[in-house]
Amino acid sequence: MRPFPISILEVEKAHNDFHARFDATQRKYLYRIVNRKSPLTIEKGRAWQVHKNIDVDLMKECIPSIEGQHDFTTFRSAHCQSDSPIKTLDSLKISQSEENIYFGFTAKSFLHHQVRSIVGSLKLVGENSWSPNDFMNALNSKDTVSYTHLR
């Protein structure tokens, strides 16, 4: 088994010059935080473990400020190859089931490290290290240098 297995849920025939990266009409990412103190065993490498208590409702307050079209410069990697930092986040869903916190992102395209940087910022909000207003200020700052710790 590969270190990071994937599952194919659906297949459709595509034209011969179809390019998976450039012709995709939608992408979905599911990111998971396991919020507990005991170490991960089976899930190690498949989820991000956070020991501090996380307030999911506080993180959800940030959703309206990030959905839609924005300049996501703050949340892009220095190695990002995208011509523009402007992307449209179609939806962000945050849910919790016991110790698991799920982040579901849907968009046509994402910047390099955009999802992990957003989740890192939302984690700061959930831990009460940042307020939802701090999150919005980070997005609006368009400053990759000051926020490199998010990646």
Predicted regions and their residues:
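A hydrophobic, small-residue-rich beta->alpha segment in the mid-to-C-terminal subdomain
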Residues: 118-130, 134
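Residues within well-ordered alpha-helical secondary structure of globular protein domains
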Residues: 62-65, 121, 141
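Acidic/histidine-enriched alpha-helical segments
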Residues: 10-15, 79, 129-143
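Conserved small/polar residues in nucleotide/adenosyl-binding loops
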Residues: 148-151
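Non-catalytic RNA-recognition surface used by pseudouridine synthases
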Residues: 4-106
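Glycine-rich phosphate/pyrophosphate-binding beta-alpha loops
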Residues: 109-112
